[in-house]
Amino acid sequence: MQADFHEYKKISNFINLIKNNEDLEFIIGSGFSESLEKELPLNLSLNKGNSIYLHKQIKSKKFFLDLKKNKICIPHWTLKKDISSNYLVKDFKSFGGNMINNYIKKIKLNKTQYFQKIIKGEHISIQFYSKDLDIKILSICKQLFRKDHCNPFIIESIVSKKFKRTIINKLHKICLRISRFYNLNGINNLDLILEFKTKKLFVIELNARPGLSTNMIYSKHKTIFKKSFEKEKFKNPSFFFGTHIIYSDKKLTLNKKQYEYIKNIQFSNNFSELPRENEIIEKDEPICLVHCKSKKFKILRDKLKKISYKFIRNLELPDG
């Protein structure tokens, strides 16, 4: 499932409105980087992120070939049909857990799909800032998934987590190698699996743009795009940060009463990407994001659940 903005005309109109502003800095964010087919008609030297060309490179077979060339561990993948059920069916363009399915016998792959071996381990994502062939780790998060057998890796939450220095050093080395190979710029997200048995790190995918962790990053690194931003050594956080996605269990069009509730919470630090009045949200699409922090991991998880439950109840939605 690819991002559907329902508003390509509005996006085009907005770009036409701003494209003559030669001093305008911009970032191509989540969803847009996966959907756009060509570079924006803006001053590309002011792009604070990565190009559409690069996004297309890393969302293709070439990405895995590049990683192998750089001796970076990835799960075994193949286009052959004679495999066992301990493989997933993935799309090279997958992000956020979309376009990943469990193996089905006699399945026929399309041109952008492949089989990837299942690695039993902890799913983590690392956010890092790239500039001038150097990097700074911004945060390291644990990924939590929705309970959905057909789509087992749809991300529901990310929560920051503390890791041993040996793991942090390994993550830094992997990010630095990838960043230098692709000459990455700005905020990037790398998804990995820390294998339970061997403690080996396997790279799953690179998303070379801001994503679900944006709120978390800006709450800790407010000067990230300023010249004064320093690339000091990453330290485990004193607070745990978390972001939870509230999905709709049915097709939803916000009525006036529901939108009044949305307006009352729109300036809360606990919410972002809230919907507009009369906006149509399809079943299983995100409604909004919930954010909070705590000094204890368990309390953070409980707070995310409590805030999400209250939101769902006030919108009179089924629990989910």
Model-derived features: where do they sit?
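Peripheral (often C-terminal) accessory segments that flank ATP-dependent C-N-forming ligase machineries
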Residues: 228-320
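Generic beta-strand structural signal
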Residues: 82, 108, 130, 194-196, ...
